[in-house]
Regions:
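Proline-threonine-serine-rich low-complexity tracts
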Residues: 1-282
């Protein structure tokens, strides 16, 4: 009997196989899930032995909005044959930040409107923990007056450039009356001596807003008396928003000047009975 031998070498050099996991998209870097070997579900090998799946690394492309992270897993069979599969994780925030519109403001004059202030936007927030930038955009007037409405706009922008606009309504409406003093009184001997109305006698008109003030004659009203008669002369003082006051000037008509006449020529008569009767026509 003769024995012969055959050497059979078992040496698996075929790498295992597996599919790359599906791409994941998240809003924020904090939303990137932890590595999980269970996302590899179809690992296989030509030999029926245990296959080990392991996390290898996360590598970012260094970009932002979006940032792409390549996550690598190794697939190792019982003979140490290794395959690598990768999963793309895209970090891209497309969610708008939030902020509230500012409360309305009211001003008497356009000069009282406060300057823009980004610090008035106090509740800005975002789904991702990055810097939020608040900026003044512009003031737009409705072109009205008394009131005029100004819409002030601020932008709120997150780190990925997602932006919203918030507004503040500013109403400019002057409801404060102008001021002026009553002109000094006048005295006249006769009604015909009363001077004509003159708006320039009102000299100290003023208003809280720097716009033209109009003074106008309103009326002369007599008390109906005589010797003296009192006339109340009224002027109106009106600002640019139609706020109006009335000022008055008292004019007293009182004639205190004696009349004049010449003595009649002398008359000579011979007898007392010849003295003529009184005659006012002389």
């Amino acid at each position: 009997q003769t024995l012969v031998t055959q050497t059979i070498t078992i040496n698996d050099i075929t790498p295992p196989t597996a599919s790359s996991p599906a791409t994941i998209t998240v809003d924020c870097i904090a939303d990137v899930p932890a590595p999980d070997v269970n996302v590899i579900t179809d690992e296989a090998d030509n030999c029926p032995a245990a296959i080990v799946v392991a996390f290898v690394s996360d590598v970012s492309d260094g970009a932002t909005c979006p940032e792409t992270i390549t996550r690598t897993y190794s697939i190792t069979d019982a003979c140490g044959n290794i395959s690598l599969v990768t999963q793309s994780i895209v970090v891209d925030d497309d969610v708008f930040p939030t902020a509230s519109n500012l409360g309305p403001l009211t001003a008497d004059c356009i000069g009282d409107v406060p300057a823009p202030d980004i610090n008035l936007v106090t509740d800005e927030s975002d789904n991702c923990p990055g810097a939020i930038t608040v900026a003044f955009v512009g003031d737009i007037s409705d072109g009205g007056s008394c009131p005029e409405t100004i819409t002030r706009t601020y932008s709120v922008t997150d780190a990925c450039g997602n932006q919203i606009l918030v507004t503040q309504t500013i109403t400019v409406d002057d409801n404060i009356l102008p001021t002026a003093s009553n002109p000094g009184p006048l005295t006249a001997d006769c009604s015909g001596s009363i001077p004509v109305p003159d708006v320039n006698v009102v000299t100290d008109e003023a208003d809280n807003c720097p716009a033209p003030i109009i003074v106008a004659f309103v009326s002369d009203v007599s008390d109906g008396g005589t010797c003296p008669e009192t006339v109340t002369r009224t002027y109106s003082v009106t600002d640019a928003c139609g706020n109006q006051i009335l000022v008055t000037q008292i004019i007293t008509i009182g004639d205190d000047i004696d009349p004049t006449a010449s003595n009649p020529a002398p008359v000579s008569v011979q007898c007392a009975g010849d003295v003529p009767a009184p005659d006012i026509s002389v």
